[in-house]
UniProtKB/Swiss-Prot annotation:
Cellular component terms per the entry's GO annotation: cytosolic large ribosomal subunit
Gene giving rise to this polypeptide: rplN
Biological classification of the source: Bacteria, Pseudomonadati, Pseudomonadota, Gammaproteobacteria, Enterobacterales
Membership in a protein family: Belongs to the universal ribosomal protein uL14 family.
Database matches in Pfam families: Ribosomal_L14 (PF00238)
PANTHER family: 50S/60S RIBOSOMAL PROTEIN L14/L23, LARGE RIBOSOMAL SUBUNIT PROTEIN UL14M
Self-association state and partner proteins as the record states: Part of the 50S ribosomal subunit. Forms a cluster with proteins L3 and L19. In the 70S ribosome, L14 and L19 interact and together make contacts with the 16S rRNA in bridges B5 and B8.
SMART domains the UniProt entry points to: Ribosomal_L14
The keyword ATP-binding is assigned to this record: no
Name the record gives this protein: Large ribosomal subunit protein uL14
PROSITE patterns: RIBOSOMAL_L14
Amino acid sequence: MIQEQTMLNVADNSGARRVMCIKVLGGSHRRYAGIGDIIKITIKEAIPRGKVKKGDVLKAVVVRTKKGVRRPDGSVIRFDGNACVILNNNSEQPIGTRIFGPVTRELRNEKFMKIISLAPEVL
């Protein structure tokens, strides 16, 4: 469950290391975002010569949460931290060309096939 002011790790090579959620998109008073949801983020920590810089405001899709996601068979997939993949504000395609760490199959339902194909492992 990601809400405003939540700090997340970045699971791609866009150049950002830590980001902060500033808005959960999809509804006027929506409070929480889970895996596969799009959020508005600001870059809090970035590496030199990256594609993004500190202070940039972009969109991102949540790919891993500590809360996890429940499957229809009753199993729950949880992760050690919250992570997102940074998206282009207009096309909503990933800015990075590599994805680090596993992602869940739930992204397939949300039409993020590019992230699924770049990920090293899909749970």
